[in-house]
């Protein structure tokens, strides 16, 4: 797959959360996943610990098992009052956007097992005991840049991704499916990876910068 002709600004502004436009019928070459992960390893990591691990899941039975855990969590999340409140009480424009997000999330939950590659980024050690903000920030700051780098590399190669965490409600069960040593490794997310249906993605609507910008003081 040739690299898409995107400027750095275009790459950063058009790497979207892709759900409905994932090509569920086209295999993803293992070497392409490796290329993206090689680039991900260049991301910064706290104290250069490089405490990341990446589990790539392509086996259909294991993808189905992980997807069933994801669907159980999605069903529970969909029924929460907080989710309903966000859907129905936001201003009209945001409500419409939220409906599209929920619809695409529903689609992903139904079809996750068909996505050819599941990437599960992990951190060495358990994060459950991290009680201070500085420790939590350090841990997540050592994996999120790498995953975002992976997503950017994937986008530039015609692949779509999205950050999901719902399967973590059943992290131990997922660890059993994949042979991950639960007591020593923390799963951080599940990234579906597939070719996209078309490569024409646009910048997303966002609130004006000045509504969230604080300069020198709040």
Residue positions per predicted region:
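Solvent-exposed alpha-helices and their adjacent loops that cap or buttress functional pockets
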Residues: 46-49, 110-113, 180-184, 205-206
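Glycine-rich, charged/polar anion/phosphate-binding loops
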Residues: 39-41, 102-106, 174-178, 198-199
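A glycine-rich helix N-cap at a beta->alpha junction
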Residues: 75-88, 177-202
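Glycine/small-residue-rich phosphate/adenosyl-binding loop
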Residues: 56-141
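C-terminal helix-cap and adjacent tail motif
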Residues: 2-4, 14-20, 186-218
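Small-aliphatic-rich amphipathic alpha-helix that forms the alpha element of a beta-alpha
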Residues: 38-41, 117-176
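N-terminal targeting/leader regions
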Residues: 1-27, 31-39, 48
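Short loop-to-beta-strand entry elements in the cores of soluble alpha/beta enzymes
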Residues: 47-58
